[in-house]
Amino acid sequence: MSGTSARDATLLAFDYGEKRIGVAIGNALTRSARALVVIPNLNREHRFKAVGELLAEWRPDALVVGLPMHPDGTPHDMTQQAKRFGNQLNGRFGLPVTWVDERYSSVEAEAGMRERNVRGRARTDMLDAEAARVILQQYLDQLSDHEPH
């Protein structure tokens, strides 16, 4: 991972949606994640320009993409689009991509924001980034201290 120990890896996570893409950043050493930004998903050119700028700024070692699934684990309408997005990230930027089951991430994100009294426009504006944080935190929480990351 680009000269960085896997245990100290910086990760960017994405909650891919048709209209917006939530982005979070985290670190494997501290096992912490935070919501970063929401990218309007206007078109392919805009999407990858914005992602490229984030990658240049944060220099992550790997990427995590939420994989939408129905509650019973079957593929969702957005499953294939999220997979394609992750594959495009890998192809364009050459970074490893891990997919994480994102069932209930938006529900958990909204509940967490409500708990912190984030209201109105602020909650709407950051919900997708908070969902990306939840996805990344799930990934970080499942990392074993004994396996390479």
From Swiss-Prot:
Enzyme class name: hydrolase
GO cellular component, one term: cytosol
Location of this chain's protein in the cell: Cytoplasm
EC number(s) reported in the record: 3.1.-.-
Family per record: Belongs to the YqgF nuclease family.
HAMAP family per UniProt: Nuclease_YqgF
Role of this protein: Could be a nuclease involved in processing of the 5'-end of pre-16S rRNA.
Record's protein name: Putative pre-16S rRNA nuclease
Organism name: Burkholderia multivorans (strain ATCC 17616 / 249)
